[in-house]
């Protein structure tokens, strides 16, 4: 029977076995929760991948930016590729949570290992009388596992049993026969040599953990044994020592283990046989040789005692136990090793949750922005194009005379230069005799044509430059902005139609343009500079009449092609040009081109608008899916993984006296937890899935925020699965504890300067939340806590959400709720409204309800009055500037409420003025400062 026949000491092995069972049972329970969370996480990512087809992939890449958001960390590179469980992380976590614990006993020699095994199991199962050296010993590996019946067999590791007659099979045994432990030297069967001895026993400890006694060094080194087990089980390594000192081979073995595996090891000095099992206690100043050797090997350090007491941070460290009665520390050591493993796994899983949850939130911002800004961009594009069209038509209608003058001026300024260039011109593809004899009429026509082309090209460039400068302002005021806006619309539409192309846009800009035809029209009709400089179709049409006019000139064959002849041809061509006709032709064709471009643009824009209409419907569906399904579901998994991490590191908090009750939970005093003292513990029992989701998201937002002096710190969370006797599940939120809330402070009486400082603190806290993209939605007296110096901190982020994650639900405390909250469409200005009401209480100095609200018989009556514009009354003690600030903050039109960046300096000015005035005139109140 377990526990009988073992070496005895004070307390016996039963206590050690019970403690070890508790440690491994604790591990297995938490491992089961971690495995469940991992299964749900994998299922979540599968559901996200296949939900609504490719809708999520197309929606993930929209938008051009996101606010900092709760938690930060955006995704700008395709989105959907990151909303996934990376394969390497999934495989690593799956492997980690599938490991079962195993106690591996190493040692100086077989006797030490066997003696330790016998002590642990409370039975003399292995013989301890072997006298051969460890290097010459040939004992095989021994594995002890749980079963209902005692059984001994040879088995290949993780494979099958060998059919082999063993000494233990011949009859009853208490100690396993020596010959079954040995590897026979004459055995020719390789399977027999590598097989391990498997011992099945009905012991309670073996239900929780397998125990393996390593083979002797003569058969397999400790390093090789560890190599086999490292990626299969969770090892708790024990090193049994029977001698007063480690031998050189022991030191070398331990040194190699440390270099290769960096494992913490529990070193135990087994008692000498036949000697009193209770070793004499050493004083703190006495350090054994073993301790010094392990210090030199860097297994032990001076920051924890030689007795093996656990370190304060509960990180697994090697221990040395030289007294049998302290073997119970093996339970502490095992718990630390197991805890470290669980914490690392829970942390890795929570990092996956938080990373993807932050991406979801940032994408919700992107989608919300897309829904808001796309219709405005379409309207802006239509309006600006129309303004551009009308402006260019006005130029064509009103500036014909200016164009005529411009052409005359250009010709006049360029005439000499043109004539000189024509005289020096070298003709192409025409052979001119050196003696200047006349050439054929065909060659003469070619010469004339080349001179015409020279004049046309030079005049084209000069007039184009003049025309560009005349409409230069249009390029900046219309075309540039219009093009950027249109490009953004086209890109977002293209991504929705062809999601895969969004990844290629950095390589090929043309790929993501949805309407190349529309772009060509804009380039031809509106980009005046590009059109004239590039010699496009418009340019050729504008100057076609120039060619026709020049070609109608009658030429007399010259006696020879000389410089004078070329100059004469050029001069006649220039003089034959009509500036008025050219100007009229330019304006006429310009108007024609503008009309056709305008009509084509309008048609293309309607097509683009239709495409965006369908895309925005899908985006809104996806936005709802993210807000109401994906993000809350992932947030709950994140809450569970983080709570598991917290309970492993810091344990379950102890509830003190009740401090107060709220709508969704009870607040208790908690003396200390996780190194924080004192704490407040909020116990919340979510009644349904919606409240679970809200709580999980609240927790994520609070944990994502950096510590801020105007917000109450959240230290951690623990999920109590046995709350109320196991009838329900409670979430315990451990927070910073402060002195009192503002409601209690006002009832007790606070000085004016203190109250105004509290108002400044509240504004600073709300501003920080808004800077992180969060809206509190429940600013009130009870949610402002005061420390012992009466400095304020905002608490209870139960209704706090990023704007993009708000569903329009009606939340908050009635008297602090802005009118637009009842419509379901609101933004962070609801916090400004609530602050206005809070400021009324701060300035009044009491907690009595405003008369207008006190007369209301019900919440519905109160809400109706607020919607109709009823607000708190002005009290006689109010300063004029304070009253104006209140009225501005609770304005019924949310767009007219001041930004908190404006409110804060106003409050500071009020405080400086009133408090300085009060110090000079102690009896002066708020009403005297108007």
Swiss-Prot record:
<dbReference type="GO" id="GO:0070161">
    <property type="term" value="C:anchoring junction"/>
</dbReference>
<keyword id="KW-1003">Cell membrane</keyword>
<keyword id="KW-0963">Cytoplasm</keyword>
<keyword id="KW-0829">Tyrosine-protein kinase</keyword>
<dbReference type="GO" id="GO:0004674">
    <property type="term" value="F:protein serine/threonine kinase activity"/>
</dbReference>
<keyword id="KW-0175">Coiled coil</keyword>
<dbReference type="InterPro" id="IPR011009">
    <property type="entry name" value="Kinase-like_dom_sf"/>
</dbReference>
<feature type="domain" description="Protein kinase">
    <location>
        <begin position="653"/>
        <end position="907"/>
    </location>
</feature>
<keyword id="KW-0472">Membrane</keyword>
<keyword id="KW-0547">Nucleotide-binding</keyword>
<keyword id="KW-0067">ATP-binding</keyword>
<dbReference type="InterPro" id="IPR051302">
    <property type="entry name" value="Dual_SerThr-Tyr_Kinase"/>
</dbReference>
<feature type="binding site">
    <location>
        <position position="682"/>
    </location>
    <ligand>
        <name>ATP</name>
    </ligand>
</feature>
<dbReference type="GO" id="GO:0005524">
    <property type="term" value="F:ATP binding"/>
</dbReference>
<dbReference type="GO" id="GO:0005737">
    <property type="term" value="C:cytoplasm"/>
</dbReference>
<dbReference type="GO" id="GO:0004713">
    <property type="term" value="F:protein tyrosine kinase activity"/>
</dbReference>
<keyword id="KW-0723">Serine/threonine-protein kinase</keyword>
<dbReference type="GO" id="GO:0016323">
    <property type="term" value="C:basolateral plasma membrane"/>
</dbReference>
<dbReference type="GO" id="GO:0044344">
    <property type="term" value="P:cellular response to fibroblast growth factor stimulus"/>
</dbReference>
<dbReference type="GO" id="GO:0045743">
    <property type="term" value="P:positive regulation of fibroblast growth factor receptor signaling pathway"/>
</dbReference>
<dbReference type="GO" id="GO:0070374">
    <property type="term" value="P:positive regulation of ERK1 and ERK2 cascade"/>
</dbReference>
<dbReference type="GO" id="GO:0043066">
    <property type="term" value="P:negative regulation of apoptotic process"/>
</dbReference>
<feature type="coiled-coil region">
    <location>
        <begin position="383"/>
        <end position="428"/>
    </location>
</feature>
<feature type="active site" description="Proton acceptor">
    <location>
        <position position="778"/>
    </location>
</feature>
<comment type="similarity">
    <text>Belongs to the protein kinase superfamily. Ser/Thr protein kinase family.</text>
</comment>
<dbReference type="InterPro" id="IPR008271">
    <property type="entry name" value="Ser/Thr_kinase_AS"/>
</dbReference>
<protein>
    <recommendedName>
        <fullName>Dual serine/threonine and tyrosine protein kinase</fullName>
        <ecNumber>2.7.12.1</ecNumber>
    </recommendedName>
</protein>
<dbReference type="GO" id="GO:0016324">
    <property type="term" value="C:apical plasma membrane"/>
</dbReference>
<dbReference type="InterPro" id="IPR000719">
    <property type="entry name" value="Prot_kinase_dom"/>
</dbReference>
<keyword id="KW-0418">Kinase</keyword>
<dbReference type="InterPro" id="IPR017441">
    <property type="entry name" value="Protein_kinase_ATP_BS"/>
</dbReference>
<dbReference type="Pfam" id="PF00069">
    <property type="entry name" value="Pkinase"/>
</dbReference>
<feature type="binding site">
    <location>
        <begin position="659"/>
        <end position="667"/>
    </location>
    <ligand>
        <name>ATP</name>
    </ligand>
</feature>
<keyword id="KW-0808">Transferase</keyword>
<dbReference type="GO" id="GO:0004712">
    <property type="term" value="F:protein serine/threonine/tyrosine kinase activity"/>
</dbReference>
<comment type="function">
    <text>May act as a positive regulator of ERK phosphorylation downstream of fibroblast growth factor-receptor activation. May induce both caspase-dependent apoptosis and caspase-independent cell death.</text>
</comment>
<keyword id="KW-0965">Cell junction</keyword>
<dbReference type="GO" id="GO:0106310">
    <property type="term" value="F:protein serine kinase activity"/>
</dbReference>
């Amino acid at each position: 029977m377990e526990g009988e026949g073992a070496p005895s000491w004070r307390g016996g092995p039963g206590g050690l076995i019970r403690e070890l069972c508790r440690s491994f049972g604790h591990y297995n329970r938490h491992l089961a929760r971690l495995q469940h969370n991992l299964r749900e996480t994998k299922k979540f990512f599968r559901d996200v991948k296949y939900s609504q087809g490719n809708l999520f992939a197309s929606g993930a890449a929209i938008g051009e930016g996101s606010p900092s958001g709760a938690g930060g960390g955006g995704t700008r590179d395709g989105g959907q590729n990151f909303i996934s469980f990376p394969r390497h992380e999934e495989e690593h976590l799956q492997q980690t949570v599938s490991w079962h614990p195993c106690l591996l006993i190493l040692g100086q020699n077989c006797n030490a290992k066997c003696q330790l095994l016998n002590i642990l199991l409370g039975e003399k199962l292995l013989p301890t009388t072997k006298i051969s050296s460890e290097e010459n010993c040939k004992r095989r590996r021994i594995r002890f596992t749980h079963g209902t019946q005692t059984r001994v067999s040879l088995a290949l590791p993780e494979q099958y049993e060998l059919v082999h007659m063993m000494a233990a099979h011949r009859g009853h045994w208490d100690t396993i026969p020596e010959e079954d432990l040995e590897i026979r030297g004459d055995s020719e069967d390789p399977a027999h040599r590598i097989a391990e001895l498997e011992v099945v026993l009905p012991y309670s400890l073996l239900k929780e953990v397998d125990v393996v006694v390593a083979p002797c060094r003569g058969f397999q080194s400790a390093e090789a044994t560890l190599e086999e087990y490292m990626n299969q089980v969770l090892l708790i390594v024990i090193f049994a020592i029977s001698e007063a000192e480690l031998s050189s081979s022991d030191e070398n073995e331990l040194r190699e283990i440390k270099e290769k595996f960096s494992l913490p090891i529990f070193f135990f000095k087994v008692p000498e046989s036949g000697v009193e099992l209770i070793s004499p206690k050493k004083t703190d100043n006495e350090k054994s040789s073993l301790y010094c050797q392990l210090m030199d090997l860097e297994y032990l350090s001076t920051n924890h005692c030689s007795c093996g007491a656990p370190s304060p941070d509960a990180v697994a460290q090697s221990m040395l136990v030289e007294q049998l009665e302290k073997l119970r520390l093996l339970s502490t050591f095992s718990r630390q090793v197991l805890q470290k493993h669980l914490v690392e796994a829970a942390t890795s899983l929570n990092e996956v949750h938080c990373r993807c949850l932050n991406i979801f939130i940032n994408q919700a911002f992107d989608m919300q922005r897309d829904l808001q800004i796309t219709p405005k961009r379409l309207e802006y594009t239509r309006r600006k194009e129309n303004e551009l069209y009308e402006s260019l038509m006005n130029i064509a209608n009103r500036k014909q005379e200016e164009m005529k003058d411009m052409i005359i001026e250009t010709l006049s300024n360029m005439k000499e230069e043109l004539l000189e260039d024509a005289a020096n011109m070298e003709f192409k593809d025409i052979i001119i005799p050196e003696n200047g004899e006349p050439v054929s009429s065909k060659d003469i026509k070619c010469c004339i044509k080349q001179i015409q082309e020279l004049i046309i090209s030079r005049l084209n460039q000069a007039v184009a430059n003049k025309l560009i400068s005349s409409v230069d302002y249009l390029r900046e005021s219309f075309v540039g902005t219009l093009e950027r806006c249109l490009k953004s619309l086209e890109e977002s539409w293209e991504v929705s139609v062809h999601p895969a192309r969004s990844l290629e846009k950095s390589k090929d800009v043309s790929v993501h343009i949805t309407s190349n035809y529309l772009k060509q029209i804009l380039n031809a009709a509106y980009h005046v500079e590009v059109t004239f400089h590039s010699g496009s179709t418009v340019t050729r049409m504008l100057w076609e009449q120039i060619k026709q006019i020049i070609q109608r000139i009658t030429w007399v064959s010259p006696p020879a092609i000389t410089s004078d002849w070329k100059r004469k041809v050029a001069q006649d061509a220039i003089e034959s040009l009509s500036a008025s006709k050219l100007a009229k032709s330019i304006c006429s064709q310009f108007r024609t081109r503008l009309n056709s471009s305008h009509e084509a643009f309008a048609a293309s824009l309607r097509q683009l608008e239709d495409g965006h209409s369908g895309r925005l419907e899908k985006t809104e569906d996806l936005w709802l899916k993210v807000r109401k399904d994906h993000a809350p579901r992932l947030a709950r998994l994140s809450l569970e993984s983080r709570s598991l991490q917290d309970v492993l590191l810091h344990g379950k908090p102890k509830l003190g006296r009740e401090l107060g009750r709220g709508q969704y939970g009870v607040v208790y005093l908690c003396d200390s937890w996780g190194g924080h003292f004192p704490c407040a513990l909020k116990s919340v029992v979510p009644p349904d899935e919606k409240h679970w989701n809200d709580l999980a998201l609240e927790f994520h937002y609070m944990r994502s925020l950096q510590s801020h002096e105007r917000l109450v710190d959240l230290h951690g969370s623990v999920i109590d699965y046995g709350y109320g006797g196991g009838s329900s599940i409670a979430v315990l939120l451990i927070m910073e504890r402060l002195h009192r809330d503002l409601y209690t402070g006002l009832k007790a009486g606070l000085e004016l300067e203190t109250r105004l400082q509290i108002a400044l603190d509240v504004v600073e806290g709300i501003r920080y939340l808004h800077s992180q993209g969060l809206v509190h939605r429940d600013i009130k007296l009870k949610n402002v806590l005061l420390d012992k110096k009466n400095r304020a901190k905002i608490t209870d982020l139960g209704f706090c959400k990023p704007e993009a994650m708000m569903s329009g639900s009606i939340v908050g405390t009635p008297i602090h709720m802005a009118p637009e909250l009842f419509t379901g469409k609101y933004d962070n200005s609801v916090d400004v409204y609530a602050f206005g009401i809070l400021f009324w209480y701060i300035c009044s100095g009491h907690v009595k309800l405003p008369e207008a609200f006190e007369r209301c018989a019900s919440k519905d009556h109160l809400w109706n009055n607020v919607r109709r514009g009823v607000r708190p009354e002005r009290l006689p003690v109010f300063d004029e500037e304070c009253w104006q600030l209140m009225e501005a903050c609770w304005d019924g039109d949310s767009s007219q409420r001041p930004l908190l960046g404006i409110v804060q300096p106003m409050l500071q000015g009020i405080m400086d003025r009133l408090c300085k005035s009060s110090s000079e005139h102690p009896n002066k109140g708020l009403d005297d400062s108007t």
